[in-house]
Curated annotation (Swiss-Prot):
Name assigned to this protein: D-cysteine desulfhydrase
SUPFAM superfamilies registered for this protein in UniProt: Tryptophan synthase beta subunit-like PLP-dependent enzymes (SSF53686)
Protein family membership: Belongs to the ACC deaminase/D-cysteine desulfhydrase family.
Subunit architecture: Homodimer.
Source species of the chain: Klebsiella pneumoniae (strain 342)
């Protein structure tokens, strides 16, 4: 089915050529299964990552509205905030970031290195809060305060995950389908599932373009019971915006995020080291390390529906390695 309605939405060309889809020969040999990787860690701005796909749509909407300031929120080591700040710098916009310390650490590297260091390089106005208990409300309050200072703010939700931002991953599904056509028939796709926009966009796009592929979201912050409504709500909102039906079930694995968001665990760090040592590719402790841990354990435990090739969607995050180096 066509995704032609995507073209109705304004989009900034921030990424350019499709990101690579590569075969991982040494990891495949190690796991006894064909593993491919979609390299969204190589998007061209600010050390890469998946949020740039969402920001192509969100920043275009901000410019359409005449905004001169992008406001968003996340953890101190948020990849999304880092990429939003970079886009703001590229477009000549002010950026205000509302940050929390979700793991309650006083470690200097977490507080000032990695993504947080890059925010300073992008001249981001950083506001700290005790916790993002109601980020939508907190962002609206911040926007009101910034507007009173004479700015024209545009609020971008946590992770860039709303129906507009998630269109970036419908676009990514189109890229994946085109790259796989005539080359490989993927049986399963694995992606980290956090703020839910990436997962929901892929769910809508892959249902239309690669319905044979099983999509698995490995949660990085919530149980299935808490995450499922978020993904389903966004999946339906994205489908509605494109005048599509979204009937595919959402599959989530929540066995790999403990002890919680932003806190590394043993299996996640083992996955980070494994991919670095076998393929020279950097994962991160918060998202992709835990998602890869799910992929590895899923093969071991025979959790996948069949034994065909698996595609891992690499959403980026390597700058956070410098904030977590004691765990390495």
């Amino acid at each position: 089915m066509s995704l032609q309605n995507l073209t109705r939405f304004p989009r900034l060309e921030l990424i350019g050529a499709p990101t690579p889809l590569e075969y991982l020969p040494r990891l495949s040999d190690h796991l006894g299964r064909e593993i491919f990787i979609k390299r969204d860690d190589t998007t061209p701005l600010a050390m890469g990552g998946n949020k740039l796909r969402k920001l192509e749509f969100l920043a275009a909407d901000a410019l359409r509205e005449g905004a001169d300031t992008l406001i968003t929120a996340g953890a101190i080591q948020s990849n999304h905030v880092r990429q939003t700040a970079a886009v703001a710098a590229k477009l000549g916009l002010h950026c205000v970031a509302l940050l929390e310390n979700p793991i309650g650490t006083g470690a200097e590297n977490y507080l000032s290195n990695g993504n947080r260091l890059l925010l300073d390089l992008f001249n981001t106005q950083v506001e700290m809060c005790d916790a993002l208990t109601n980020p939508a409300e907190q962002l609206d309050e911040l926007a009101t305060r910034i507007e009173a200072q004479g700015y024209r703010p545009y609020v971008i939700p946590v992770g860039g995950s709303n129906a507009l931002g998630a269109l970036g991953y419908v676009e990514s599904a189109l890229e994946i389908a085109q790259q796989c056509e005539g080359a490989v028939e993927i049986s399963s796709v694995v992606v980290a599932s956090g703020s839910a926009g990436t997962h929901a966009g892929l769910a809508v796009g892959l249902e239309q373009l690669m319905p044979q592929a099983e999509l698995i979201g490995v949660t990085v912050s919530r149980s299935v019971a808490d995450q499922l409504p978020k993904v389903v709500a966004l999946q339906q909102a994205v489908a509605n915006s494109l005048e599509l039906q979204a009937k595919a079930d959402i599959t989530l694995w929540d066995d790999y995020f403990a002890p919680g968001y932003g806190t590394p665990n043993e299996e996640g760090m083992a996955a980070v080291k494994l991919l670095a040592q076998l393929e020279g590719i950097l994962l991160d402790p918060v998202y992709t390390g835990k998602a890869m841990a799910g992929l590895i354990d899923g093969i071991t435990q025979k959790r996948f529906k069949d034994e065909g090739p698996i595609l891992f969607v690499h959403t980026g995050g390597a700058p956070a390695l410098f904030a977590y180096h004691p765990h390495l």
